[in-house]
Amino acid sequence: MKGEKGFQRYYAFLSLFTMSMLGLVVATNIFQMYVFWELVGVSSYLLIGFYYTKKEAIAASKKAFIVTRFADLGFLIGILIYGYYAETFSFTPAASALVAAGTMIPLALGLMFVGGAGKSAMFPLHIWLPDAMEGPTPVSALIHAATMVVAGVYLVARMFPLFIDYAPHVLHLVAYVGAFTAFYAASVACVQSDIKRVLAFSTISQIGFMMVALGVCTSLNPHEGGLGYMAGMFHLFTHAMFKALLFLGAGSIIHAVHSNEMSAMGGLRKYMPVTHITFLIACLAIAGIPPFSGFFSKDEILTACFRFSPVMGWIMTVIAAMTAFYMFRLYYGIFWSDRKSAVSDEHAQDTEHAHH
């Protein structure tokens, strides 16, 4: 961001986003959570459209705002139904009120999941996330890796006692939507040539893993024992770390080569050794190679999936293998393939020094 116009504006928007996200996490009831949820959406819109002189950035920010608002309508209706029948917005309402509500509570929780699916870019509401890469790369690292896009996963996890007791079939829906999203996004990531779009579809796929982990953890599956819930939250934390590292590495590379296209890169390990090492570590982590963090969180998710259903277990294993394929395709294309375009040595060194 050095030398960018609107530096103060960037930090103002970033502070608003951080405040909104912290508020969402510490909210003590579902309505308070919704207020901060919407503030996160507004600050995301402002950050994605930071380069407001670029038509692509303006279009991307509008797309993200409209798609997530559409999903949030479902979230709001779900909150209102829940509040009416539970007679409170608390995360821990009286059991008698929920039992008396009958099928309305599963309906409310299903609608809340629609809101979470929009924020977490689940199929078919995933369309905004790849375009959201128009924002500054540090924003991509924070919003589209570590925090905002996993807000939907956090929502399902926060309401988890209600899901597991009153809407276990909705959790199955969460698992199936997550599995399809993970497979679809991984297959698209395998053929992308834009470095940030590969990471965007990778993020969608990994969020699918988290949703599957939560979804397979139901009272209808007595052998599960809460492993899926723990694994989903564990993967949320590990993914935040290695995906933020990947995005910051991508920003360093883009700054050096002035292009997002992998065709403009190749052989950069000689010119950007620090970026090369950090990017490799993040690739090993997301691919699930031991002893990196991704191995432990994905291992727990796959264990939970196999306990739920062997079919689900094998599907997620294939998707994990696809993750390793597209990440090492990206890594090889950037750092080891034959160099296709000139990169200024001074520029690469400047970018490297920024790491120190």
Question: Which role does the model predict for each range below?
Answer:
Residues 38:
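Short phosphate-coordinating micro-motif centered on Lys-Gly-acidic
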